[in-house]
Amino acid sequence: MLPFYAQWVLESYDKAISPLLVSLLGLFSIASVLFVPKNRRFGVGFFIGMLWFYWISLGLRYFDMSFLIPLVVIACGIFMGFVFYIGLWCECLIVRFAFLLLLSYLTPFGFDWIVPESVFAYSYIGVDKLSFALSILALWILFKYKTWWKLGGVICLVFALDFGLKDSKIQNLPPLKIKLAQSAVSQDFDYRMREAKSIFSEHISDIQKAINEEYDVIILPESAFYVPLDSQYFPYFDSLLEMSHKIVIIVGALREEIHTDGRASYFNSTYKFDKGKVSFYDKVHLVPFGETLPSFLLPLVNTFFQGIGGFSAGKDFGYFDIAEIKFKNAICYEGSNRGFYADYPQYVIVTSNNAWFVPSIEPILQKNLMKYYARLYGSVIFHATNLSPAAIITPFVSSR
């Protein structure tokens, strides 16, 4: 956890964290799990769970369920406490080694952010499983053995370093001038409905400003236009079509689909406006307990609470073609999902709305996971955000 919190503090002062510092803090974090006494394993897991995932509860603020926040935070702690209690039952190398290597495969209800390797995302240490295994082995040898055996730990650590980290990001970027919008819109529903006209107008102004500054592409955040674009609440559709002759517009919006029986399905979508034509991709990988719910919980939740789990999932991930360059589209949570990167996309567009979870460590965790996957799969990620810093994330160790 230490690299995440250090990065959070430094970035709040617009300071980049040193890869060397991340490397050292990452090794310390892994060591704190590797060598935890078995009689303290539940307590350590409990506090790690709370510090790592307390932010999950913050979205409840917008559904009049703030009273549940402490319970959810404690539940996160208890869950990770039991995981540590079961996984760290023995203080031997083979058990601790296997636990740390396999922890990233733990995905409760599809939630796949339990990735200990991500502590090395901005470090000099490799993020693949082999490098992680060598780091664990190095720590074990350095702390458990004496005299010349420690040399073996140093050798393991040297081989865990990523020597392919030459920072050639300039040559790796597409030949397009891309504007990443960074908005600051509260998630409060009353505010969003009351100020919709001014918020949407500001987004249109941002697009016009990007045109004036001669950008080729502008990417706006997830749900920047949080109503269906063909609804009476959105008078700017024709303006977007007209502006798209001067700039390619990528923007998040709500999409409504009416079925033959009159039922409506709602999708979290990304639209592309280009030369007067419109295309879109729906979000495929929905957020557990936010945009989707396990089927056994639906009757209970629909009885007491409205507005949670109301989105439908899209069918497939897709690529936007911009000036004959392919960009794979991801919406928020998808950009930190391993399955999304399975085809090794060269360029990725990620749009996010982090208003649900700020102020918290969530944007830092998201950024580190995207950096982790960028390094693992060689992708360049263009991340446009609401209420967190926008960024170009490369496969190289740098401030990005």
UniProtKB/Swiss-Prot annotation:
Membrane-traversing stretches: 16-36, 42-62, 67-87, 97-117, 123-143, 377-397
Record's GO cellular component terms: plasma membrane
Protein's recorded name: Apolipoprotein N-acyltransferase
HAMAP family: Lnt (MF_01148)
Location of the CN hydrolase domain: 181-400
Membrane topology according to the record: Multi-pass membrane protein
InterPro entries: Apolipo_AcylTrfase, C-N_Hydrolase, C-N_Hydrolase_sf
EC number of the protein: 2.3.1.269
PROSITE patterns assigned: CN_HYDROLASE (PS50263)
Record organism: Helicobacter hepaticus (strain ATCC 51449 / 3B1)
